[in-house]
Amino acid sequence: MQELFNNLMELCKDSQRKFFYSDDVSASGRTYRIFSYNYASYSDWLLPDALECRGIMFEMDGEKPVRIASRPMEKFFNLNENPFTMNIDLNDVDYILTKEDGSLVSTYLDGDEILFKSKGSIKSEQALMANGILMNINHHRLRDRLKELAEDGFTANFEFVAPTNRIVLAYQEMKIILLNVRENETGEYISYDDIYKDATLRPYLVERYEIDSPKWIEEAKNAENIEGYVAVMKDGSHFKIKSDWYVSLHSTKSSLDNPEKLFKTIIDGASDDLKAMYADDEYSYRKIEAFETTYLKYLDRALFLVLDCHNKHCGKDRKTYAMEAQGVAKGAGMDHLFGIIMSLYQGYDSQEKVMCEIEQNFLKNYKKFIPEGY
């Protein structure tokens, strides 16, 4: 555990736009640290334990990790999105699972209470609504079983879906769908068959399909009214296949012809879908990567400038702080960041809010950043 924690802390030192952590205190008074990411490239994911920086949560005692409290799935990618999922022997696919279109929520034990966290928070709207489902008397057997699993050191990962949590697909009721169960210390997964044998977990379990056609990938891409599938390899690794129908709605295929829409797709985290769709189109693939690189370089610089300025001057009076902020933003040729630096002084309490402001300001000024040749 300590080595994993140290590697995750090291990742967060490099660039806050890539990997970061946030601390929060639960209702029981316990402190938790969640490691996650904003944007990262293939080379970033090659770093030690980077793939685990996707919502893993530690209970903390000061700066010392006490235990891994929750372990979501590691980061995995679309087929042909990057070298991780290129040249895969498809004969090694064991089975496929329906890819649900909601928000990941994962269990953790807070004292003697079983609760959900989302990818980045123990207090997000999705986590709180999922907790509400768990507390419903109709799900008391599930709640008791998940608590037993957590006490034994396992995380149950679910997809939270609801009419009010729509991404692309419309769900008619609020529910949680069990994706997998993972051992906190080792990261190993309980097999689908073993989960299916559990009469309490089975009704919540995501649907599995055996591969019965050599053209299953083509059929998956041509499917409609579904996000896609998660393919599980015989060695336990995963990759995603998304339907062209879903990608066209989520990331808007037409965004390739519109710089503003393409930047928006990147900011929304949907460029991976586009790259997978255009894996065989060299010009389009390189265009997406060029826009990605431009935005990520900007984000690195902007986030560092904003946070560094605030950290250096936050103890000063408002007038002095404003003068320093104005000088920093103007000196960097990024006057539009002045308002964000001032927002920090006024009490922005999370990097997520800062990121949102930077993203919105970038889109307002996107014409300045269109890569040469496009």
UniProtKB/Swiss-Prot annotation:
Cofactor: Mg(2+)
Cofactor note: Binds 2 magnesium ions that perform the catalytic activity via a two-metal mechanism. One of the catalytic Mg(2+), which is coordinated by 5 water molecules, engages the lysine nucleophile and the ATP alpha phosphate while the Mg(2+) orients the PPi leaving group.
Marked site positions, Essential for RNA ligase activity: 159, 246
Keyword check for Magnesium: yes
Broad enzyme group: ligase
Effect of residue 37 to A: No effect on the ligation of 5'-PO4 and 3'-OH termini of the RNA strand and on tRNA repair
Protein name according to UniProt: RNA ligase 1
